[in-house]
């Protein structure tokens, strides 16, 4: 049976995911495919390039850099997370992304974004970690209201989390059968309807289908989490999630809080490492 690693978004809650991934890298845990949404895509690419420690390193180092994430960046560029800094200067110069290792890794890597024209999810299979792949990763993490939409491959895209919390359903639809799922909220979390009605109305003027998708986002999220839970009960999935809500804001500027979220993920992965190995080994035998 083909295995897939599934990564939820959640902005800086993604440091939990980074902790899990680095334990996987340290212990040679591998999958046939991996997929991420939003922060799950932005940080998950380091699992494919096998760069253990990179994501927590640069996030702690630059979390207070206004070019990385700041209201000033939002006012100046239209992006809360500075696009040029995050997707060019950082991976090309400041903390180089290993594109060669990414391209040579046989694990397939998928990222999901939301099509502004339809309000539906669209997915991209990355190839070499180059400019096109990074444009899709940026699109996957382009949060509405605080990011420009990304135009790529005939689409105008925003954050994948508008539609899909994780790529679980998509990966299942293309033939993957066993899943390790990394969530960034505790099990049983129920998403409530967003109170940002005014922002949705403003968005409706430019992207009416996105506004419609946001209006039912909580329903889609909760239904997806239920499907994942049922898959776990059926023995088709194994879920890692924080035991308690993570003490990090979406745009967290405290490096110690980022480290604690990372350490929480690493501890969860170490505790479940034998169970994960057994689950993946069983998948090879089925």
Question: What is each model feature region?
Answer:
Residues 1-37, 45-286:
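Patatin-like phospholipase
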């Amino acid at each position: 049976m083909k295995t897939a690693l599934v990564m939820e978004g959640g902005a800086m809650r993604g440091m939990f995911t980074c902790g899990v991934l680095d334990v996987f890298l340290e212990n040679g845990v591998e999958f046939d495919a991996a997929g991420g949404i939003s922060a799950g895509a932005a940080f998950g690419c380091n699992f494919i390039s096998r760069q253990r420690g990179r994501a927590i390193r640069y996030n702690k180092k630059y979390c207070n850099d206004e070019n990385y994430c700041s209201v000033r960046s939002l006012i100046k560029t239209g992006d809360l997370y500075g696009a040029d800094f995050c997707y060019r200067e950082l991976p090309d110069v400041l903390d180089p992304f290993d594109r060669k290792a990414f391209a040579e890794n046989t694990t397939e890597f998928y990222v999901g974004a939301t099509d502004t024209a339809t309000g539906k999810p669209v997915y991209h299979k990355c190839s070499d970690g180059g400019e096109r792949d990074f444009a899709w990763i940026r699109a996957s993490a382009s949060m509405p209201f605080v990011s420009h939409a990304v135009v790529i491959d005939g689409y105008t895209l925003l954050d994948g989390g508008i539609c899909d919390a994780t790529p679980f359903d998509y990966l299942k639809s293309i033939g993957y059968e066993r899943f390790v799922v990394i969530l960034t909220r505790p099990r049983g979390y129920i998403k409530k309807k967003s109170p940002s009605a005014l922002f949705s109305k403003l968005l409706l003027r430019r992207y009416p289908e996105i506004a419609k998708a946001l209006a039912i986002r909580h329903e889609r999220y909760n239904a997806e989490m239920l499907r994942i839970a049922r898959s776990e009960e059926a023995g088709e999935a194994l879920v890692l999630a924080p035991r308690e809500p993570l003490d990090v804001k979406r745009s967290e500027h405290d490096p110690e809080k980022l480290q604690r979220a990372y350490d929480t993920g690493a501890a969860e992965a170490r505790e479940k490492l034998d169970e994960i190995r057994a689950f993946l080994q069983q998948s090879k035998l089925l």
